[in-house]
Amino acid sequence: MFDRSAAYYDRVNTVICLGMDVRWRRWAARRALASAPARRPTARGRDTSLGLRVLDAFGGTGLVALELARRGARVTLADISPGMMRIARRRAERRGLSLDIVAADLTAHAAAELPGAPFDAITVSFGLRYVDDPAGLLRGLGAALAPQGEIVVLEAVVPCGGVVAALAGAYFFEVAPRVGALLAGRGELYAQLTSTVRALGGAGDVLAHVRAAGLLPQEQRLFAGGVVAGVVARRPSGMVSSPAST
């Protein structure tokens, strides 16, 4: 399904997100690099992301991965859609950026076995809702982190509480899928979007999956009236690494 929609997927999403998705992804990239354990000061006393190893899990067309690479990180993008990864590769080439793009089903294979592991940081943007066992996925990603490394999760969620959340939810679940289906001609894609978000639940449910994975929540952010949640979690010092990451 994602292969068939790869050519227009990002454009349609930006329209139905009213352009706000750019800011969300920039936040994820910036936050992933902000406190990576390998980050070092420059001669002028400013932090640098140069050389930090980052995994962009479920990286798709590379929007977050390219933000990370633009900031100097060494990025591994992992996804299962050849069409999406093809676009990511083309974008990287056009911008003169380097991405290590790997075809990998992270629900079936250990992230710690990917090239570049262990990683200083990992991003998971709008992919958690598509897996049957979110906590299990996050646990596997946590094992691929360097000690004290962090995972940044960005995900669409069911908003809760207040008038703003109700309006945002009405737009996201009723208006946006219709607009997306009209623009893309693929109603089933946007029907799946809303159904998977409802199945995942709210921001509190994402946080619960993070805790169930044995990770330590550090920060939670809500965007767009609570329709999008950002969660930052750290690998605890006692978490067991996969043999491939030791």
Question: PLM features: what roles do these ranges have?
Answer:
Residues 213-216, 221-246:
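Core SAM-dependent methyltransferase catalytic element
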Residues 1-8, 172:
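N-terminal, positively charged/glycine-rich alpha-helical extensions of SAM-dependent methyltransferases
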Residues 120-134:
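A short SAM/SAH-binding and catalytic strip from SAM-dependent methyltransferases
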Residues 154, 158-213, 219-221:
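C-terminal alpha-helical "lid/dimerization" subdomain adjacent to the S-adenosyl-L-methionine
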Residues 135-150:
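A short glycine-rich, Lys/Arg-flanked "PGG" loop and its adjoining helix->strand segment in the class I
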